[in-house]
Amino acid sequence: MSDKLIIFDTTLRDGEQSPGASMTREEKIRIARQLERLKVDVIEAGFAASSNGDFEAIRSIAQVVKDSTICSLARANDKDIARAAEALKPANSFRIHTFIATSALHMEKKLRMTPDQVYEQARLAVRFARQFTDDIEFSPEDGSRSDMDFLCRVLEGVIAEGATTINLPDTVGYAVPEGYAELIRSVRERIPNSDKAVWSVHCHNDLGMAVANSLAAVKLGGARQIECTINGLGERAGNTSLEEVVMAVKTRRDYFNMDVGIDTTQIVPASKLVSQITGFVVQPNKAVVGANAFAHASGIHQDGVLKARDTYEIMRAEDVGWTANKIVLGKLSGRNAFKQRLQELGVQLESEAEINAAFARFKELADQKAEIFDEDIMAIVSDEEQEHANEHYRFISLSQRSETGERPHARVVFNIDGSEQTGEAEGNGPVDATLHAIEGKVNSGAELVLYSVNAITAGTQAQGEVTVRLSKAGRIVNGVGTDPDIVAASAKAYLAALNKLHDKAVQKINPQI
């Protein structure tokens, strides 16, 4: 009989810590809904005590997602845990994930606490969390570099207090598969009450072994939960990729003898959504979700696949959600057809007014390009949700003039808190002139550190998707804009990034777990 492997997604918490990957509340809700469609077991929606923005995002997700357990991170103190419980209150099912560092280095230099103090605080934190839920996860931060005897003492203590999941993180991505699996196995064998908890792993990819370490811990160490993110999103080199561990376990069920509850046909839609929202492009040769993951260029391979797919394909593209682009709607399509397609794509707009506004954008786009694809519709929805996000800056219109031998000129009209502003400037090119026209009015002082353009679909009529990354005072944000006109998409992306910079939420606490 096979065991169940729990998939714990932390895209919205640890994934968001990747520089530039900060998301709005509305964007987090969209991703959470997609994770629910993916049938993720646990969604770590954020760190409630880190900022009011995270608290509100967690509470909103708890209100709308009903089929996955919603989790908030909390430091091992009453204030953090109570804040997490308050944010999670609307959820059908919720978990509190509390943590404290257990390595000698962290205890001495960061916490300035003795081992006995850390042991007691860990136990008291779990005991306090039990007032709110029976589903409690505990993580010993920097556990892989902790003294084994002390680590086992702490974990035995928190299990005795009611912790139901124990997570042993490879905080700095230093572990190797056999050694990490042995750590999990040894700790489980040394703790007399280890059978009272589910054992979890959380790996970082600094040495490119996050997936390998996680799978080794499952196969050889007895772990039954993997903490991961869509596309491996995360700070530094990223986290364990959800899509890779899930498909490894499903494809090699003969080896792992594990079941996962994931609807794998939702993997590619989830990957595309996270990429679109964060602006982090998926590399073409990325396993499972890369554009070339199922492409065969070799003539020998192509011949084999045509004769029998399993000659060179160990999994089918359609099983993970890859589908050929379909023309789904056109300029003669009506509102009901548009609404039906939104439902098929899993998009839930909050009101009829938002559906009407999105449909109006669709009709505008249909006048500009004859063929409308699913990716176009998703871009429309993304733009529409940004319009309803109480933006400080909002794009209205753009005009430009460019002739050979002359410097391009741009005129941008946009709102600042509802007040219409017009910026004009010249530049080295149309995009440069446009961004200077905006910056001349807002004077943000932000540094442009990345500008990239991608076509959403094939063909010369495709919408362009522009990603702009801005840096200011140590904060890095991404903005994404879409439009058939690349220059207009650039203006939208720049204003979207400025909106995130304008967010007055206190800089969040980003724990290294």
Curated annotation (Swiss-Prot):
Catalysed reactions, as listed in the record: 3-methyl-2-oxobutanoate + acetyl-CoA + H2O = (2S)-2-isopropylmalate + CoA + H(+)
Job of this protein: Catalyzes the condensation of the acetyl group of acetyl-CoA with 3-methyl-2-oxobutanoate (2-ketoisovalerate) to form 3-carboxy-3-hydroxy-4-methylpentanoate (2-isopropylmalate).
Q: What is this protein called?
A: 2-isopropylmalate synthase
Query: Gene3D superfamilies from the xrefs?
Result: 1.10.238.260, 3.30.160.270, Aldolase class I (3.20.20.70)
Which InterPro entries does the UniProt record give? 2-IPM_HCS-like (IPR050073), 2-isopropylmalate_synth_dimer (IPR013709), AIPM/Hcit_synth_CS (IPR002034), Aldolase_TIM (IPR013785), LeuA/HCS_post-cat (IPR054691), LeuA_allosteric_dom_sf (IPR036230), LeuA_bact_synth (IPR005671), PYR_CT (IPR000891)
Question: One GO molecular function term?
Answer: manganese ion binding
Question: What GO terms in the biological process aspect are recorded for it?
Answer: L-leucine biosynthetic process
Q: Does the keyword Secreted apply?
A: no
Give the record's subunit note: Homodimer.
- Tell me the PROSITE patterns matching this sequence: AIPM_HOMOCIT_SYNTH_1 (PS00815), AIPM_HOMOCIT_SYNTH_2 (PS00816), PYR_CT (PS50991)
The Swiss-Prot or TrEMBL record lists the needed cofactor(s) as: Mn(2+)
Q: What pathway does the UniProt record associate with this protein?
A: Amino-acid biosynthesis; L-leucine biosynthesis; L-leucine from 3-methyl-2-oxobutanoate: step 1/4
For Mn(2+), which residues are the binding ones?
14, 202, 204, 239
Domain Pyruvate carboxyltransferase: start-end pairs: 5-268
Where can this protein be found?
Cytoplasm
Residue span of region Regulatory domain: 394-513
Question: Which keywords describe this protein according to UniProt?
Answer: Amino-acid biosynthesis, Branched-chain amino acid biosynthesis, Cytoplasm, Leucine biosynthesis, Manganese, Metal-binding, Transferase
Stated EC number for the protein is 2.3.3.13
Give the domain of life: Bacteria
Instruction: Tell me the protein family, please.
Output: Belongs to the alpha-IPM synthase/homocitrate synthase family. LeuA type 1 subfamily.
A single GO cellular-component term on record:
cytosol
- Native organism: Cupriavidus metallidurans (strain ATCC 43123 / DSM 2839 / NBRC 102507 / CH34) (Ralstonia metallidurans)
